[in-house]
Amino acid sequence: MMQFHFQFYVGPVFTLRPSKGFLSTCLVSFLFVTTTFCSYAIADLNSDRQALLAFAASVPHLRRLNWNSTNHICKSWVGVTCTSDGTSVHALRLPGIGLLGPIPPNTLGKLESLRILSLRSNLLSGNLPPDIHSLPSLDYIYLQHNNFSGEVPSFVSRQLNILDLSFNSFTGKIPATFQNLKQLTGLSLQNNKLSGPVPNLDTVSLRRLNLSNNHLNGSIPSALGGFPSSSFSGNTLLCGLPLQPCATSSPPPSLTPHISTPPLPPFPHKEGSKRKLHVSTIIPIAAGGAALLLLITVIILCCCIKKKDKREDSIVKVKTLTEKAKQEFGSGVQEPEKNKLVFFNGCSYNFDLEDLLRASAEVLGKGSYGTAYKAVLEESTTVVVKRLKEVAAGKREFEQQMEIISRVGNHPSVVPLRAYYYSKDEKLMVCDYYPAGNLSSLLHGNRGSEKTPLDWDSRVKITLSAAKGIAHLHAAGGPKFSHGNIKSSNVIMKQESDACISDFGLTPLMAVPIAPMRGAGYRAPEVMETRKHTHKSDVYSFGVLILEMLTGKSPVQSPSRDDMVDLPRWVQSVVREEWTSEVFDIELMRFQNIEEEMVQMLQIAMACVAQVPEVRPTMDDVVRMIEEIRVSDSETTRPSSDDNSKPKDSNVQV
């Protein structure tokens, strides 16, 4: 251990000055600690890389993995997710890729920071290596639909939240050590070969439990009696709530004392009437017996039907958002076409269509081309699923357009397309999910004194990001490729002041609208007439978007139901009459020294919404002009604090 010695000299001057040797020692120590930390971080990631490469080399797989030493493990390896600091692997998701055989030891068990392990729907077999169930940080384990065997291991991770080992060949008893998993909320062990009693899990925070279709026996612990009967069905030797009550070992003794009764006197009859009595009695008894048997059969059938209906009702009651999602954006999926979700190269997602249909769904919004859903899959993966409506294109044309959208979407300011699905009745698109919302919600949502307004700097940065994204689409897609649906709700916030565009390139797939709406909204005048979108019509729509950002008003204003005025016309009328600050968003009035920049941005917008398409600038020109505003801003020092002063009146030539 390194020790530091200080010497104090008592004298007329009480000053403590560290020696040069001490400072040098501190500096060396600091560099040593920093270097050691970085070395450990690099070593951890290299160790994880070698462990995964060893796993891929030892376990055959039908689907090709892009794992190699040249690709960056955290950025491009399929199914691999790293920690936020990029020092180790924290999630491995490889469902349904055809993994075959046992998991070798000293491979996945060396991923010491692993939190999520999903190898479901493969052909894996054998026992789970001890080093896997000894991983200390596992939160979610999905190993269902494989052929694992042996006893269910005792997982040591105290933070284990979900454990799914269903549809395997595990044998033996359910470990009593599961009581120690205080954070466990979901346990799925159905369709195995487990035997023995059900352990008491009263110390566990279970919300979902399924032990059905095993060989369990004994009484169900009272702490688990609140789960539905479907959680325990298929275990014939299991009893207790919610199943049938457990029978006692021997019948209880009768409380009624035994009283001997004398035999009944013989029924008097004549010898000659013996045959007549026999015939007259047999026929009614036979008829009555048949009627009784028929009645019993009917009662049994009614009970079975009622029990089946009751079971189906209970199943309906426990349906989650999963089934709701399947009905919403999976209602048109055809059974023969399941699992035909098409992923694009470079996509790190690894799930199939059935996983997507099982995901919980939340409606994000309904737009011109369909409804967008936030889908949360079971491995904590969140994506956006766009369910398209009124698609007129055939399968080949649809697939070709998806390829183009994926190719041109490779830009920081564009939301990338990750996968798609096509069938006769259902068309789906899968994109990344960004939790920060969109520009429309920032501008118009929850306006008032309690809302933090979107400041001017953020508005300019967001506008510039969107402009760069559209300019990239025009350059990468060629002269015939346009966005076609530019609006504030399609400007998605990646993080603060950083945005990207979505919902582009879908116009060629859609049926031609029957008639335009009364208000123009974001659409250029020529689009209202020809129904054709071009680069210039995108420029017009982007000009409307800038006006929306400047004014804080929606692009279609309705002073009254009978009088609808589009935003460009309203701004032009205000400017032509006499320029006032009323055209700008009132929430911008608190910021100082931004009048000149707002006027410059307004001039850009008015150039974009020119009636004649040829007069409008290109998107590259728009990007350049906005960047010039940013340059002038950096050269001018102005306070960023709030101020109640209003911008001065300015003159704008339109």
From Swiss-Prot:
UniProt biased composition (Pro residues): 250-267
A Pfam family recorded for this sequence: LRR_8
Gene Ontology CC: one annotated term: plasma membrane
Transmembrane segments: 282-302
InterPro entries referenced in this protein's UniProt entry, alphabetically: At_inactive_RLKs (IPR050994), Kinase-like_dom_sf (IPR011009), Leu-rich_rpt (IPR001611), LRR_dom_sf (IPR032675), LRR_N_plant-typ (IPR013210), Prot_kinase_dom (IPR000719), Protein_kinase_ATP_BS (IPR017441), Ser-Thr/Tyr_kinase_cat_dom (IPR001245)
Positions bound to ATP: L364, G365, K366, G367, S368, Y369, G370, T371, A372, K386
GO molecular function, one term: ATP binding
Broad class of where this protein is predominantly found: membrane
Span of the signal peptide: 1-38
Name of the protein in question: Probable inactive receptor kinase At5g58300
